[in-house]
Every structure is written in C-alpha cells, then in structure tokens.
C-alpha cells in the first residue's frame, strides 16, 4: 500500500502503527526510512524480537488506540490494521495525533468488522456479497470525510484476511481540503476480479507489503 499510495520515502517522518501485532507494518515503515514508529497493540509479547529492539521503534503493548489522546510529538503518518473494532471508532481519535498541515493515514478496511451483525452472521464471519463491500466502503469513506479527512486513494488489499475475507486499503489526508468522489474511488476497484471469499486467508509475511 505504501507504494500504491506513493509513500515510499518516509525520511524524518514519525509514524504510528495501530494494531502492530508481529510488526509487519512497522517493518515496512522502517524499510521506507521512517524516523520513528510507535508500535501500538492491545496484545503483549507478539512483536518480533528484531523489530522490538530497533532503536527507532517505541513499543506500546497492552494499549488500546481508541483511548490514546496524544503522543509526546506530532505524528506524520498513521497505519491501521485493527481487528474487532470499526474504523469509525478509531478515525476521530487518530486525527488528534496528526501533524498539521498534512497528516496521512493508511487504513485497512475490514468489511467483517464494519458490516452489521446480520450481514456478518450470514457468512459465518465471511463477507461474500460485493454489494456489502461497496456499502461498507461508502460508509467508512463518507464518515472519514465528515470527520475532516479527504479520501486520497483506495485499493483492494493484495492479501485476504481470516477465512479469506476480502479487505481494502484507504489512503486518507487530514486535514482534507476538497472531499473526494467516494463513488468514483469505489467503482474504480477491480470488481470484475471477483469478491467471493473461497480460500482461507494467507498468513502475512514478514515485512508485509502494505
């Protein structure tokens, strides 16, 4: 996603990785030159040992991002790969962290955690209906823009989530200047490639390309 959104040069940027887990996204940020990464996760002891001991990484375990009001320095870029919580809960919090005049967010949109319970239950936790995918993307991106972000880009994630769930990546700018055409972003996705989750999710590789 960093390459897709032209975020390949992160020199001097201070970043936050929400849902750091083993550190795949953190590693990706470091490889692209991030000055510092705050690795935030509700879990404990999961972060890869090498990443944990990198002097550019600030490990923040047992921390729920929704309750973090500020960091001790302005944040330039936030990446989000969170489960069991909606981006509509996180985005209003994240905007408080961002460094004016231009903060950026790369967020993984997971329909299985954004759709209603009835839609999720029908597929035993797997969202197969492309119309639900579209509705979720519309809800999240329109919400983000109401919160002052601009939806700068949207792609389908090259990796599926648990149980083969199809997921998406959004690039948001805060504060946004001109609202994006959300429908155009959504319809620009490769829907003809199919959105039926039939295969089990693949484990995310070290230094996952996001």
Label for each model-derived stretch:
Residues 35-89:
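S-adenosyl-L-methionine
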Residues 166, 171-210:
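Flexible, glycine-/basic-rich loop-and-beta segments that form/coincide
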